Amino acid sequence: MAFQNILFDLDGTLTESGPGITRSVQYALHQMGIEEPDLQKLEPFVGPPLNLSFRERYGMNEEETGRAIHYFRESYDTKGIYENNVYPGVRELLQMLHEQGSRLAIASSKPEPMVHRVLEHFGIAGYFDVIVGSHVEEELDNKMGADNKLLMVKKALQGLGLTGEPEAAEDPEHVMTGRPEALRQDRRKSYAMVGDRSFDMNGAKANHVTAVGVSYGYGSRRELEEAGADFIADTVEELGRILTAYGD
């Protein structure tokens, strides 16, 4: 039986957004006096909160981070947002899940207005019951950092009606990959969070829902394994099989 409530990350999970994001980061760095000709080196910016990436990768302070994000938006909001494509098979997956009655949500660190623009641009907004992204103040809040995704997942779960504390599971190893029968011990495990980075898996774990990683995005299989993914899909087709086979 399929998961009845499924949260998706956006960048690197539903859409191949790397080109637009990396070029916009490159532009922002140039404006800050930093030259980075190799776009591949900027791919780690896809997924994590921007403030965290600029701080950790370029040692920027709070004021510099705010300026870098401003320059990033100058490029991304008008051009980079459209240098993007839906991964092959994603439309069909969303249609299938929608038709079988699963409720779908977006939990993204991207600013919420941008999330809506991307989904509407590709004509897939209608599949989602709940769409959650960050607010400007959250994106700029240097104290938020990696906790941003945890909050987005929590908000999306609340939008789907899941509130309160998780029930205790009898088996402490209930999150191990390959143990679908144990996932049924906790109602929250009928909810899945799908993403391509450790931040997505951490967001799922912190909110006690099933963590489903996808290795076709911008994070490696190793990153997902180390973050404790319950399941990992190497293709969109495999993701579909996981989401329709292991839900409670």
Model-based region annotation:
Residues 55-92, 165, 173-174:
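Metal-dependent phosphoesterase signature
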Residues 193-231:
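Acidic, Mg2+-coordinating phosphoryl-transfer loop and its flanking beta/alpha structural elements
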Residues 2, 78-106, 110-116:
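Short, acidic loop-to-helix structural element flanking the phosphoryl-transfer center
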Residues 123-133, 223-243:
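Structural recognition of alpha->loop->beta junctions
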Residues 112-192, 198, 202-206:
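Substrate-recognition "cap/lid" segment bordering the active-site pocket of phosphatases
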